[in-house]
């Protein structure tokens, strides 16, 4: 995207938001299905002529499948902060010419949802037929629907909730501490 992308805890300049598409956008521009990924997948949800390798949702997305690319124009957005092409801590900050590292703003689900809006804007799509997500992607789809209700017709949230449960929060905290306790972590600046 161009310009400054405002986030819950800061901002980044001209972020790259990676995404993949399948199918054709109709003339009315009303057949878009927007998919948000879970925590670890890339935007490569299914194979395509550009990339024939199998995607993580290969059985769900494609011609004649539940998300039918003969009927829908599908956009799968790669989350900000991930290592699959979107701007994140390993990216170069265009303002400083150095890696963001720990200066990258702490991400929120709302930030990821808003990055989906930026992708839709770049494609000239005002409203999606359906927004879909599983796990963290389901939380993102819910956030997208709440923050931008005029931009979505339907919501499908799979294996998700409106907030993280205490067990999940504790597990993620333990995972962060494991990384921080690594002797070569160097406070994240490596």
Locate each region found by the language model:
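Ligand-binding pocket scaffold of soluble enzyme catalytic domains
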Residues: 1-190
